[in-house]
Amino acid sequence: MVRMAGSMSDLDRRAFLSRLGKAGALVAAAPWLEAIGLAQTRGPARAFLRRAPGRAEFDRRVLGSFLEHLGRAVYTGVYQPGSPLADAKGFRLDVAREVKDLGVPIVRYPGGNFISGYHWLDGVGPKPQRPTVLDRAWNSLESNQFGTNEFMEWCAAVGAEPLLGLNFGTGTVEMAVDYVEYCNLERGTRWSDLRRSHGYERPHNVRYWCLGNEMDGPWQIGQLQAREYGRKARDAAKQMRVVDPNLQLIACGSSGTFMPTYLTWDREVLEECYDQVDGISLHAYYGNTAQWSGNSTARYLAMNLDMDRHIHEVAAVCDYVQGLQRSSKRLWLSFDEWNVWYRARDAQSTNGHGTAAPHLLEEVYNLEDALLVGGFVNTLLRNSDRVRIACLAQLVNVIAPLVTNERGVLRQSTFYPYAWALKYARGRVLDLRVESETYPISAAGLQNDFARNGNVPFVDLVATIDESAGQAAVLMLNRDLDGEREVVLEWEDIVPARVLACETLTVPDLKAFNTFDEPRRVIHQPFAAPAASSRMSFKLPPRSYTLAHLGLRG
């Protein structure tokens, strides 16, 4: 997680892509919309949907989330001993219920920037013996009362899989390997027996691991050069696989498109460790600011297309290195930090001033933020053939869809598009092409990595099909700020039989947000759907995100 808004000068990193052949040319070229199945047309938007027999079911980990020891994410977020809202273990029951009902499939932990100064041993064993330390990433007191084993218990309670991060800042390779042994070996070694002595006889069997966090960033504790990091990752991965050969390991990719070494970092890292890792991470945060969007809501709501481009570019680098090394292995992507984050980025919002559980990064989300989150969901599902894991950063209190106080938990506006995807998007992503009228965007005055001229479709759409359940889900974003948009769904080899649910998220005020006093200002509403048929016409409200859940004819 980047502490400061990106303002570094932008090198000509995309010149590198021009040497990657067809794949690089595709994503670097101006008409990148064509690459993701979007085309220009006039009149009603039209979506042509059909089964994609060559596409496997998407990995539901693409709808994961993130929990960092930062601000109130852990303490007073998921964990608050002594609260009347907590159970005997200190877990907030209201938060656990929300997360379990959401069905979050995987949660990344414990960081984030926090991980680069964290020693996992501080957070295990008898609680009275755990040290209180100063977290230097966020200048906050860390009591270590919630650590690895508590996180594993919490994951079991909410039905989520753990994704653990390793300290590649102050941490050593040996420390990382010991952590895997503590978590995954059953018995008979120093660290597995230590876990058993802590009351956890069965191993946690953590499959997914992040090899550090944003190690290219000057804000990161223990920042490394690309090849230095790549060699460390390779060494750690080799030793970790001796302990557990079934691990899935994620190399630390570039911290973002704003970095001067963006893509070059990824290439150099992978040239050192490609054969020892399974995926590479991507991180990105977005906001409606002068630098990023020109304070234009129209440009802001198109930022999920920047995410599309980001994914294609990093995938192109992975494939380039695969070709260089004559490897048969194809890396997948882990977009394990993404969200809207731009208001709570100042020094006061990112510095805990040596206190415990300070109010940090507590972004208040409005309707336009929720619409963009819906766009991000569409992008991630659209690219789920390459993106295996993605984590909405974060889950509770810190740039999060859920916010707590002493009385309960609040659903922010961004909760709803995320919840729809988790509840309804199942099975395979459908092969589709969308034809939509467009509006222009301009590069003038924008930060280089967001600066592009082009035309953006008013309608962004993704659809999934669950063959076993006989159901389909369609998620539709209308970026038109002023007008209703008609969308005609043309089902080519699928016949909807009934509408199971149809809802929309919109309110008159784009800046409206929820509070504990007014928790339903921005909330989903029933939406009148057309009759189920092979040709369905939806009239989407202005500035809206809409779900259609359909039963299919057997």
PLM feature spans:
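C-terminal segment of N-terminal export signals and the immediately downstream linker at the start
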Residues: 31-55
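Noncatalytic carbohydrate-binding groove/subsite architecture in carbohydrate-active enzymes
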Residues: 226-377, 437-452
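Carbohydrate-binding surface patches
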Residues: 454-496, 502, 543-547
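Aromatic- and acidic-residue-enriched carbohydrate-binding clefts of CAZyme catalytic domains
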Residues: 73-80, 115-148, 189-219, 288-294, ...
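N-terminal secretory signal peptides
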Residues: 1-15, 36
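Catalytic cores of secreted or luminal carbohydrate-active enzymes
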Residues: 377-384, 388-394, 401, 405-451
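N-terminal export signals
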Residues: 15-38
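Acidic, Ser/Thr/Pro-rich beta/coil linker or hinge segments at domain junctions
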Residues: 494-536, 540
